[in-house]
């Protein structure tokens, strides 16, 4: 993935660049595991979803979280109840906007990147 030490973590531009870098890494990982990427960085008033994909019959809403090392904590823990609620509202909006049936099987996954390790957590939280 290359050197990352040029990033200054306090700068919002650099945080966005880091986020984009790890979302790209997540997309590559997901694609290798059979996911079809439909959309990246879907934004609306309700919030943002990092990646929207298909995994077999499922429409999957995916949050990507990164931490440099274990001293910063488990990246998956950053997807707290408030963040989950925002993702769910955004997912509902996405489905309404694109006329996706409520009967479509959906789930919410998290891609947790800790250093150079990528971990996929399928069905990380209830998707409704």
Predicted segments with their positions:
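Conserved catalytic cores of phosphodiester-cleaving nucleases, focusing on short active-site segments
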Residues: 49-75, 81, 87
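Domain-level recognition of nuclease-like catalytic cores that cleave nucleotide substrates
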Residues: 97-128
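Solvent-exposed beta-strand sheet faces enriched in polar/charged residues
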Residues: 41, 65, 109-111
């Amino acid at each position: 993935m290359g050197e990352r030490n040029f990033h200054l973590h306090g700068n919002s531009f650099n945080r966005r660049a880091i986020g984009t870098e790890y979302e790209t890494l997540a997309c590559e990982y997901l694609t290798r595991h059979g996911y079809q990427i439909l959309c990246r960085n879907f934004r609306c008033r309700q919030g943002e979803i990092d990646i929207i994909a298909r995994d077999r019959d499922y429409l999957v809403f995916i949050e990507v979280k990164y931490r440099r090392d274990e001293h910063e904590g488990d990246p998956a823990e950053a997807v707290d109840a408030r963040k989950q609620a925002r993702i769910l509202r955004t997912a509902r909006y996405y489905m309404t906007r694109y006329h996706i049936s409520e009967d479509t099987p959906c789930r919410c996954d998290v891609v947790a990147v800790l250093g150079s390790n990528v971990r996929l957590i399928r069905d990380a939280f209830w998707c409704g």
